């Protein structure tokens, strides 16, 4: 089994109150050379599912750490990760920027879901609607190596948690307002109308900031996919039924919400090369008992939907600074297709793989 340890670009040289954050971040950008590898870590299990580890496999060629695709833009490859909290309320759809994100995490919040969209390859202009963060974001996003965290604030408890984290805090209504060029769209009602420019948010990276590590293991070029044939997956998320359906023509999964195509405002139906389902426990947030908090360290059930197939296994993660380790039931690594990935943080018994 491979450990998804920190690998920095090999060979590259609280409920949603919109109160303000108080921490300012650095505002200059610089390109830095990063180390080839870091030692693999040994994941530990917090339940009956145990896991072992070996050293991380180094890709045969330099790849983008959030997609596994070959590097075509060296400047983008040196950027830090940018996380934008994006609204999924019905009045916020269609959103802007989802089909430009390298990775999107879908989290349950308060009878809704919210997206943590992660960018490095692309700078989405515009991106949004941007909403508040949650305490679960601190644990979930720690493996991205001190990302820029773009949000609209949160209740006092959430704001304290985010400001105390290792994120570069970018509240688009306060300390990041100028750099992000944030604005309220006139064609939607608040609070579902707050947008920013991703290119501006990237300028908030502090001097010396480095790219994120590789987050998943990917199939090599020409390597056959494994697993059982599957047409996709149905998920019962909080407040919305989600379906991902495989399109053999494009090799991508297309997203549906409550029976309707889920669209990006500029780029058509939301799609992804991979859909990773992590079955997690949700507990009440320590700062707001009405807000669910996904537990993303420990271990749990996992599914990888890729190339029209599904592989079932286990996720493990012993620390928030480490990426998830995905291991199939037969003990082999769960491999993704290079490309964009959506990660669904699903509750127990909410996942139904579809037949071929």
Model-derived features: positions:
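Bacterial signal peptide processing site
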Residues: 13-16
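C-terminal motif of bacterial Sec signal peptides marking the signal peptidase cleavage site
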Residues: 8-11
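A surface/extracellular/periplasmic glyco- and lipid-processing/surface-interacting theme
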Residues: 53, 58-101, 105, 110-356
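Sec-dependent N-terminal signal peptides
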Residues: 1-5
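Extracellular mucin-like PTS domains
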Residues: 19-59
């Amino acid at each position: 089994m491979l450990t998804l340890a920190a690998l920095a670009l090999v060979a590259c040289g609280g409920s949603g109150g919109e109160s303000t954050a108080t921490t300012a971040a650095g505002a200059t950008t610089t390109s830095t050379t990063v180390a080839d590898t870091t030692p693999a870590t040994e994941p530990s299990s917090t339940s009956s599912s145990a896991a072992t580890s070996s050293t991380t496999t180094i890709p045969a060629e330099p790849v983008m750490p959030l997609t596994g695709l070959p590097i075509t833009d060296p400047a983008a490859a040196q950027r830090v990760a940018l996380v934008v909290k994006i609204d999924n309320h019905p009045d916020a759809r269609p959103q802007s920027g989802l089909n430009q994100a390298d990775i999107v995490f879908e989290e349950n919040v308060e009878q809704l879901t919210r997206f943590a969209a992660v960018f490095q390859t692309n700078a989405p202009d515009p991106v949004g609607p941007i909403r508040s963060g949650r305490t679960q974001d601190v644990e979930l996003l720690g493996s991205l190596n001190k990302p820029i965290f773009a949000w609209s604030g949160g209740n006092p408890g959430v704001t304290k948690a985010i400001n105390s984290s290792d994120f570069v805090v970018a509240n688009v209504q306060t300390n990041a307002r100028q750099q992000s060029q944030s604005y309220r769209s006139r064609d939607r009602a608040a609070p579902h109308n707050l947008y920013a420019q991703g290119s501006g948010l990237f300028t908030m990276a502090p001097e010396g900031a480095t790219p994120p590590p590789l987050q998943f293991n990917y199939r090599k070029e020409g390597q056959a996919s494994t697993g059982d044939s599957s047409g996709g997956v149905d998920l019962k998320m909080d407040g919305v039924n989600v379906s991902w359906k495989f399109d053999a023509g494009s090799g991508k999964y297309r997203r549906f919400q409550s029976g309707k195509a889920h669209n990006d405002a500029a780029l058509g139906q939301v799609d992804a090369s991979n859909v990773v389902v992590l079955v997690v426990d949700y507990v009440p947030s320590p700062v707001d008992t009405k807000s669910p908090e996904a537990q993303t360290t420990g271990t749990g059930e996992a599914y990888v939907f890729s190339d029209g197939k599904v592989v079932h296994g286990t996720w493990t993660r012993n620390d928030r600074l480490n990426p998830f380790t995905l291991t199939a039931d037969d003990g082999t690594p769960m491999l993704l297709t290079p490309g964009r990935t959506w990660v669904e943080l699903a509750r127990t018994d909410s996942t139904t793989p579809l037949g071929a």
